Amino acid sequence: MLDNLKKYKIVLGSQSPRRKELLSGLDIRFEQKAMPDIAEDYPAGLDREKVPLYLARMKAEAYRSKGMMQDSTLLITADTVVIIDGTILGKPQDREEAARMLRTLSGRTHQVVTGVCISHRWETRAFSCSSLVTFAHLSDEEIDYYLERYRPYDKAGSYGIQEWIGYIAIQRVEGSFYNVMGLPVHLLYNELKDFGESN
């Protein structure tokens, strides 16, 4: 599948092992490269649902500005945020913040939005995906166990849906499960397919 993309060098601009795993599931050849360091800042007035797409674009621009884009490069960048009560929960700085985030999510429904940017030297395509996730009530003991065993400090909202906490606490997901993991692969596949057919 996606034979039209074989002329491109597909690069996943992300250090995330979850995004690497998900992109691998599309059976396309790619390489994973760490992105240049960027401050994940965004304009204060920006709609919260638009933040991940803004950051995905920033990551692509950082890659481009370092002269890392060749004519054959097809770069995929992404960013995922958790939103609850109009507040973005990013990656926790420490255990205390992670526990606070999980207590906030406990017994409630929150939104997960992933923004994805596909960049070629002369073209950029961007899209986002939103899912709703409902948590069961989490006890302090369950939160402590999860943080001790899984240390989710590299994850937005302090949890990985594919981990232990997902098995015991996720009551419902409305929308893409893989979006919650960090990459809406069904949309990405269609965008890559369309890109290959039109270029």
From Swiss-Prot:
Query: CDD domains given for it?
Result: Maf
Intracellular or extracellular location(s)? Cytoplasm
**Superkingdom to which the source organism belongs:** Bacteria
This enzyme catalyses:
dTTP + H2O = dTMP + diphosphate + H(+); UTP + H2O = UMP + diphosphate + H(+)
The record's listing under SUPFAM superfamilies reads: ITPase-like
Q: Where is the active site?
A: 79
Q: What family does this chain come from, according to its entry?
A: Belongs to the Maf family. YhdE subfamily.
Q: What is this protein called?
A: dTTP/UTP pyrophosphatase
Species annotation = Porphyromonas gingivalis (strain ATCC BAA-308 / W83)
The organism's taxonomy opens as: Bacteria, Pseudomonadati, Bacteroidota, Bacteroidia, Bacteroidales
